[in-house]
Amino acid sequence: PVNIGGALVSNASLHNFEEIKRKDIRVGDTVWVQRAGDVIPQVIGVIKEKREKKLKPISPPEICPVCNSKTIRDKIKTGKKEKEEKYIRCTGAFNCSAQLIERIKHFSSKSAFDIDGLGEKQIEQFFHYKWINEPSEIFELEENYLQDLLEKDGWGARSVENLVNSINEKKLIPLEKFLFSLGIRHLGECSS
């Protein structure tokens, strides 16, 4: 980890594999990192003077590191031409725990259901406990795991009550937020 603008950073975004190729980033490179918008750390380039000879280019992953499913790049038709999409994705879908967790995070994100007190850390914790395996199970937490939650470190009566109230407040949301929460490919926040 390094300190960038007062924040301790251990990961930085490269967006997609095309960025890795475009910036010619290799395993073992020393890179420049900035916090985009003073928030998200991103790799902006390689310090080529520090590059050791014979560093290997990064190969696109062929297997998901989480579920061992095959990875693919979808084809996009633009007129008569067909090209590969920028993004490499795992084909594991509901068999990939990383995808399930990210789907739940997306569902409860600010642009979707926006459930106060249910952030990334809590979602990962509840997934680990096997309390939430899909987004709809968020609404069953109170009924199924309220007592268990009270017994977990960091959860008192007040924080559990606040979470339950937050979840109950979000049972009805605008249609566009609900559509966005579903995580349908190519249906972004604006188009929903």
Positions of the model-derived regions?
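Nucleic-acid 5′ end/cap handling module spanning
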Residues: 1
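Short, structured beta-strand/loop micro-motifs enriched in basic residues and often containing a Trp
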Residues: 4-18
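A general structural signal for short secondary-structure junctions and capping/turn motifs
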Residues: 22-24, 33
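Short, well-ordered loop/turn sites that connect or cap secondary structure elements
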Residues: 24-25, 132
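Structural signature for extended repeat/solenoid scaffolds and their inter-repeat hinge/linker regions
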Residues: 31-192
